[in-house]
Amino acid sequence: GEKYFNDAGRCYQGWQSCNGCHPGDGRTDGMNWDLMNDGVGNPKNCKSLLYSHVTPPNMISGIRAKAEVAVRAGFRYIQFYEPEEEMAECVDAYMKSLRPVPSPYLVDGELSEKAKAGRKVFDKLKCGDCHNGPFYTDLKMHRIGEDVEFEKGWDTPTLVECWRTAPYLFDGRAATMQEVF
């Protein structure tokens, strides 16, 4: 699965692999992309694929109900390649094997003082209303402002490893966590 995830040779013109947008073991490239599968003019923040198989829906616009569907659609509509089912299953297995790296905000497994201060802000602003549970997501779609383009809103992403997934918000308009607030 890892081999297929990183293999650009099979896609149209042989230049793009899954790793192109999701480098470093399925994380995010920190870019906004305007993909044609949901219409032109809808730039979206590239999500990390960490825990994508247990935090549906997939893609920030929620257009894929499950990660298995998103993997196959990614090959078909982004890389313009029709994968064999066994290949797609291998990529699914690889993505399911990904685990978070230790946070630099933990000291001997405990929150640092900065992280404790951040937790107070998180609680005060009720971030946990949407970012809750073991993966810090309620697995729902939310409209998060007046300028939301999609009527159904946007997927609540996991906050696991959010310290390394800038920019933030569905369209990447917040370059830092401070800009989110």
Language-model segments: what does each one mean?
Residues 2-181:
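Periplasmic c-type cytochrome electron-transfer domains
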